[in-house]
């Protein structure tokens, strides 16, 4: 049995709206080496306020890991959950950035930003992990420092955003961090391992987080939470 999300009006997902055609096949939780490590990183990001849920119920932030069949990504409507476990992830097996569609399996459909994650894996063969997080101070700090960014007219969850991110990943392979200018407060990091991406985000917070210069930990709320 499959369920299809065809339009943004029809498919609210707790992160805003799914803007791609989503073919979801209900299935057991994905079995993926490294998933526990990915979920542990996600929990650290949640505790740091880089992933979470706003008062209106809209979630923000998602993580993914390349697999032999595609990639696993945190599922839709999970932003407010601290620890997901395998059940909180969806396996994306097929996608088309140009066609604005993807196919996924799991107890829940893939995140609304899953197509952007797919674009990174497609553009950079060395990328194994992708993190999309939100932070106003980090967003502003990276921009002020001249970080790479997507166009302002490329909105979240759209083919335009996916293409823009893929272009950066293709030009700067292996690892990088960028600002999603058309997705307020949104940043995206990618790299060859979970550890590499975690280190990249920590480095960015340490060096570009506007409100806490010199802090060696993730501290988006003014207090240090994670080393």
Description of each model-found segment:
Residues 2-227:
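Glycine-rich flexible loops
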């Amino acid at each position: 049995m499959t369920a299809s999300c065809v339009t943004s009006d029809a498919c609210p997902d707790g992160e805003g709206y799914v803007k791609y055609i989503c073919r979801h096949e209900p299935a057991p939780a994905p079995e993926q080496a490294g998933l526990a490590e990915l979920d542990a990183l996600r929990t650290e990001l949640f505790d740091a306020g880089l992933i979470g849920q706003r008062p209106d119920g809209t979630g923000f932030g998602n993580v993914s890991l390349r697999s032999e069949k595609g990639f696993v990504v945190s599922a839709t409507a999970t932003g407010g959950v601290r620890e997901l476990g395998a059940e909180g992830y969806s396996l994306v097996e097929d996608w088309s950035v140009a066609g604005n569609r993807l196919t996924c399996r799991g107890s829940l459909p893939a995140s609304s930003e899953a197509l952007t994650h797919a674009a990174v894996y497609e553009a950079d063969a060395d990328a194994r992990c992708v993190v999309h997080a939100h932070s106003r101070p980090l967003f502003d700090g990276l921009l002020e420092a001249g970080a790479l960014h997507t166009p302002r007219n490329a909105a979240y969850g759209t083919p335009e955003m996916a293409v823009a991110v893929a272009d950066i990943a293709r030009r700067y392979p292996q690892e990088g961090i960028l600002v999603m200018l058309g997705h307020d407060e949104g940043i995206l990091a990618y790299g060859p391992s979970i550890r590499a991406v975690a280190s990249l985000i920590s480095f960015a917070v340490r060096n570009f987080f506007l409100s806490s210069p010199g802090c060696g930990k993730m501290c988006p709320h003014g207090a240090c939470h994670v080393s």
